[in-house]
From Swiss-Prot:
Name used for this protein in its record: Somatolactin
GO MF assignments: growth hormone activity; growth hormone receptor binding
UniProt keyword annotation of Glycoprotein present: yes
Family: Belongs to the somatotropin/prolactin family.
Record's keyword annotation contains Repeat: no
Localization per record: Secreted
Example GO BP: growth hormone receptor signaling pathway
Expression sites (tissue/organ): Pituitary gland.
Domain of life from the UniProt record: Eukaryota
Cystine pairings recorded for this chain: 26-36, 87-203, 220-228
Record organism: Tetraodon miurus
Region forming the signal peptide: 1-21
């Protein structure tokens, strides 16, 4: 139980997991937790991970908003109405009452989190690619976009570990191809692209909040399901 709680805590604190340049390999049944997650005690106790993610998304949104304002204001105004409501996040009911939390399963929670995480990896790869095209995009903005993408991929790896540990299931991580990194269908209209990026970040922030809630529910259920609310 102690080892499992360590894994749960590590996933909740996913920014300190190994990055995409050092993928996790926990396929061996004999692999210990320490082999799967190389993490110091100080980082393990860092409880600011999700607030860091949230603030990073807000940072990106604010900077993309600045990019929009750098472009023609009249052009933006003519398109704003149809773009602001373009958010399409995953329809996923979040259990809220004590009875709902008791009725769901760990499997449902884990696969719901994995679905949300994997649905955003390629859109964020695309976002990183489009950011490079903006004349007004600073190095800080580009680095922050890369950071968010890397942490999302680390989170996916952490959830895969949990599924292996708790459900004894093997699942595949997302494969990012060269076409994803350098898409050929980039929109020639920079204004449209900036507005799409802003809408994408708005959607991602909503789903990131869902991911945080579901992982906290999972941790709570594993500790004391009948008093979890």
């Amino acid at each position: 139980m102690a080892a499992l709680q360590e894994v749960l805590l590590a996933v909740l604190l996913w920014p300190v997991l190994v990055t995409i340049s050092n993928p996790i390999n926990c396929g061996d049944e004999q692999s210990s937790l320490s082999n799967c997650l190389s993490i110091s005690e100080e980082k393990l106790l860092d409880r600011e991970s999700f607030s860091t993610l949230s603030s990073s998304i807000v940072f990106l949104k604010n900077h993309v908003l600045c990019l929009r304002r750098c472009l023609s204001h009249s052009q933006y105004s003519s398109r704003q109405a149809r773009q602001e409501n373009a958010c399409m996040t995953k329809v996923l009911p979040i259990p809220s009452s004590k009875s709902e939390i008791q009725q769901i399963t760990d499997k449902w929670l884990l696969h719901a989190v994995l679905m949300l995480v994997q649905s955003w990896i390629k859109p964020l790869v695309y976002l990183q690619t489009t950011m490079v095209r903006y004349d007004y995009a600073s190095d800080v903005l580009l680095n922050k976009t890369k950071w968010v993408l890397e942490k999302l991929i680390s989170l996916e790896q952490g959830v895969v570990i949990l599924i292996k540990k708790i459900l004894n299931e093997a699942v595949m991580t997302t494969t990012v191809s060269e076409l994803d990194l350098f898409p050929t269908d980039l929109q020639p209209d920079i204004l449209e692209s900036v507005m799409n990026d802003y809408s994408l970040l708005s959607c991602f922030k909503k789903d990131a909040r869902k991911i945080e809630i579901l992982l906290k529910l999972l941790k709570c259920r594993r500790n004391d399901m009948y008093n979890c609310a």
